[in-house]
Amino acid sequence: LIYDQQPIGVKSINNKDTDHEISSQYIFNAGHRENGQRNYIAEGLANADADDIILISDVDEIPNLDNINFQNINEKIILFKQNMFYYKFNLHLPKLIWTGTKSCKKRDLLNPQWLRNVKDRKYPFFRLDTFFSKNKYQSIKYINDGGWHFTNLKTAKEIHFKLKSYLHHREFDVNPLTVDQINEIINDKRAIYNLNVD
């Protein structure tokens, strides 16, 4: 599959726009592009059966499928709790569990971005808002030891380039880091941003 179209919702940025409007539009446009690419996955699922299990991951999220019998899972949504690795394969952030890979049966899949947006907590039965929400669910199965999330396995220069071009690049445009500052962060074994915010 090749995704070579401009996604719906991308808007032009004009010279007359305020700084706030420009920042907002950069972020919204990046989100529309990322969501459009992710939703295009559905084109490759056209021939999948209704009971097929669909897993949606970013490219740096690897689900651990050992010891999982999907036939024994009755919940609607499956969330994989993944170990987080930063900068190097052996630099584990033990205090952060990443819920990256998410899964459901094809019959329940609204679209890939919907699955990605599902909140990573199980809501109690008395939360009536879950009956009307498209991202809050009660029927969730957590897979502990659910895999690995390897992020920013790059040099400081490569991370600098990534930060200028990915979804949240506007934050970086407004508060940039130099390659030397990123190198210092790597050497201190710190995350670039507060990963608990998202």
Residue ranges and their predicted role:
Residues 1-56, 65:
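Active-site-proximal specificity loops/subdomain of glycosyltransferases
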Residues 16-18, 128, 187, 197:
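Intrinsic disorder/low-complexity signal
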Residues 30-34, 61-177:
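Conserved catalytic core of nucleotide-sugar-dependent glycosyltransferases
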Residues 42, 160-164, 183, 187:
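Generic detector of well-ordered alpha-helical segments enriched in charged/polar residues
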Residues 175-198:
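Charged phosphate-binding loop/patch that engages nucleotide di/tri-phosphates or the phosphate backbone
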